[in-house]
Amino acid sequence: MSGSFWKFGQDYSIESPVSKILNSAFIKINKDQDDDVPTGTCEENIADDEDNSSHDYAASEDNVVNENEEKEEENTLPTTESEYENYRPNLDVLDDLLDDDELYTELMCSNFKLLIFLKYPEVLSKLIEYVTNEKILDEETDSAKKPEIIEGVNDHPILIERDRKDKKEDAEEGGDSEETTNDSDHDSGDERSVDSEETSITLPPESEEQVETRRARIAAEILSADVWPISAAIMQNKDLLGRLWSILDHPAPLPIPASTYFMKINERLLDMDITGMLEFILSRDSLVARFLTHVDNPSLMDFLLKVISTDKPDSPTGVIKILKSQELIPKLLDHLNPEYGISTQSAAGDFIKAFVTLSTNSSNELASGIGPNELTRQLVSEEMIEKLIKIMLKGGTSLSNGVGIIIELIRKNNSDYDFIQLVYTTLESHPPTDRDPIHLIHLVKLFAKHMPDFADMLDKTKLPLMEMPFGNIEPLGFERFKICELIAELLHCSNMTLLNEPNGEMIAQERDIERAKELETSTEKENITAIVDNKSSYYDKDCVEKDITENLGALQINNQGSEEDELNDTGVSSVKLDVKSDAKVVEGLENDASGVELYDETLSDTESVRECLREKPLVGDRLKIALEDTKILISILDMFTEFPWNNFLHNVIFDIAQQIFNGPLKTGYNRFLLKDYLVDAYLTKKIVDADKACQDYEKKTGLRHGYMGHLTLVAEEISKFKEYIDEMKLTFCNTAVSDRFEEPFWKEYSETILADTREKYNTVLGDFGNDQESDDDVIRNSDSEDIIGDTEGNENYGNGENDELLSNGHDSGNMDLYYNFNNNENEENEEDYAEYSDVDNKNYYNNVETNDDDYDSDDGKSKSAESEFTDKISEHRDGNSLYNEDNDENGSDKWTSGTSLFPPDHFPSRSQPSDPKLQDQNIFHHQFDFEGVGDDDDYMDPNDDGQSYARPGNPLYTTPKTPPRPKTILFNSLSALDNNGEDEEVALGTSVDDRMDNEISSDEEDSEDEDEENDMGNEEGYSLYRSRSKEAF
């Protein structure tokens, strides 16, 4: 078995290299002697004495004694864990174990002796020493001791450090013994010659640094392995954890390998014993400061996020309280200042955004989310937002990271998606907790306050021109783009329901005060008093807050009363009455506490309403007022054409326009932003001018501006808004807004260019108009034309009122009447019909239950057709051929007697082949002839479900048979043409029957020769048409 892939051999008595090393890995503790002697040393000493006394006999017995000693040593090692208490580990073999390639495999296979050896505290301490080695932690040392490369030799770098070391080692060894040196040189020379013959590349010996790095990696793999005994042994010895966590005390930057080892080991311990690990982590001093020293290290910051994720609402661990007491959020915001490097700023910003995502308020996010907490509440507090805004105004990377944090806060803490809306809660029904959803009132108010500063930064930022293939352009820059993105997101935030509720701000402040008091009393032992005092400093007007609290408490008590009290006594009902009495005043005051929206056809956008909203603005309106005062929205809109190639900016501008045109019109300040967009900014004129500029530019250069796609989207928003106000019959008090829609140039643009563009956008990809029609349309149209064509030879056509029905047979509505089932005639006899209006017409395949009254007419044709149809079925059961010329002699009379308006070549549910010769030819036949395939008695399909494929001899698919005449409105109309309905039906049927006879006879003559040639193939072949099983017959 020399070529077998099994590398362990077939002899089970052969030990693995790891097991051989482990045989000498335990030293027995001898209490009688002062010195500890490894197992087997006594026997070796005795043997040595005997060898010294009798040299002649020793030469022949050395090998036998050594083998016996190894077996005895193996047998003397204990087999239970308790017996190893009398042994201590031999640390000299640890390096040999780490150098073995199969060590980790043996560990995963639960090698008993290996587990016992690795569980010793001395061994674990040595492994941690490998991981925390200064050579591993010191990145400069690693880089300084790298092999030198001779400059100027690019193709073949020469390694000179190893050569020098080899020379030194050879020189030192050369002074010991010449014979040993010569032998070793000779052996090494032979080995090198063999290696050179086998391969052209020889691996140099590992350096000391490489060996230590490899051993540190293996040690980290062992410590982080999914082996419970090792993890438990580490957790039992806190000193080992302390030495491991000393990595955080190393000055920055910390090498990535060392931080990776730290993260892997601690994550394993955290998963194994979360309680003990968190107890150790929270007991560490300056936890936040030690982690923020390495804020640039992603592995350490990811581990900190995992520690934070353990503090869930249903099982709190106290991590968030400890981190808040150590001021994690303020220190992270400090790292966003330009005083730190760009990488440090970006790392701090990324950590804050990841933490906000982890603390999302949405229940549809990842299961690992911890929900709102005190850290995120501190982040959106007035003090922290003010600090963040000042950092953002410094520009550069600070602005970019700050905008990213604000956007993440708004998107992950939308109050509209709260499980319980804040305005519907009370202190009694929902006492405030540290896990309450956070609100963004302070955020919106402070950004409205500093909006002029951001507007100045947007206007003053200028960048040098850039050379492009089509000319020099001015780049937008990250600062201006981030400001535009910030404005769009703040506009989203200002439309939240909580920020537009009159009592929303008061309720939020009341709950914040109550929550701060509870935290202050419950966390005195945890030194949270200072932070609570800082939080309480946000509210300066204590008297006003007490009055608000008392008033809201009375209002909430009244809300908890009976329904009669709610309707008569509460302040909300009184506000609703005020809304009905004075619509204009309430509309200006945002309908006070009720939020009732009045559906008035006139939109109040007068100056009096504007001033009324400015006197007592809500939080959401305060931001919109700041946007209007700074004219920042108009400045952003002008940038649409100034930067025609920046699609990111165009997308943001479209987002702003979409919010304005879809915002509330009857409440809030949004109507005035709309007026500024249409009247002051003259948006319609800008769109038309931009489209014309693009056309002129295209004529000169052959290129179109990059904003045309978003320009069309903005124009579509204006058109939809115009349709909305027309449909709702809304009018503006100020007619300037309505006049913009009635200007000639805008009407011409919307009716021509915009309409054509809309039609192109709405076209299905790959649709070529009316050039191609679907198969169903072709069949339906051909059927309708043939049916109308049949009426041309009908003598009853043109007699009067029923001509319109026949002439309009191609119309879709009349065709539906033609194909649908009619219940107007013989309702008592139509229960037995199983008829469908589409292709799967059951009467086409076979008659489930035929109505006897339809076949008992005086002419007798229906009954004869049924009898012939039954004969065809019986022939199929006897295994006749698929095509029979004898049956075709009377085929025309048999097939056309069922109805007069269903010619076989125009049957509505199945189209005929274009070549008449293919109609009676079975193209689905086997290449070889099979005997007995037509005999039903030879084979019975056990899986036949009644829908199996048809077999040869089935007459249903040689020539399509028409079902009995359906009861439709068309037939009823034809019957009403004459008082004698039966005679007219016979006459009409005869005219069409003659036509069918001629067509079928012509098809038979054309295909007669071809059928004779393929008679054998058709007789023995299979058809892919579906039919009922023979049990149905």
Swiss-Prot record:
PTM comment, free text: Hyperphosphorylated in the absence of SIT4.
Molecular function in Gene Ontology: protein phosphatase binding; protein phosphatase regulator activity
Residues that bear Phosphothreonine: T990
This protein's GO CC annotations: cytosol; nucleus
Entry keyword set: Cell cycle, Cytoplasm, Phosphoprotein
Keyword Signal belongs to the record: no
Primary site of residence: cytoplasm
Positions carrying Phosphoserine: S774, S857, S862, S892, S991
Biased composition (Polar residues): 909-924
Disordered: annotated segments: 32-82, 147-213, 768-813, 828-1033
Subcellular location, record wording: Cytoplasm
Assembly and binders: Associates with the SIT4 protein phosphatase catalytic subunit in a cell-cycle-dependent manner.
PANTHER family, per the entry: FIERY MOUNTAIN, ISOFORM D (PTHR12634:SF8), SIT4 YEAST -ASSOCIATING PROTEIN-RELATED (PTHR12634)
Family statement: Belongs to the SAPS family.
Protein name as annotated: SIT4-associating protein SAP190
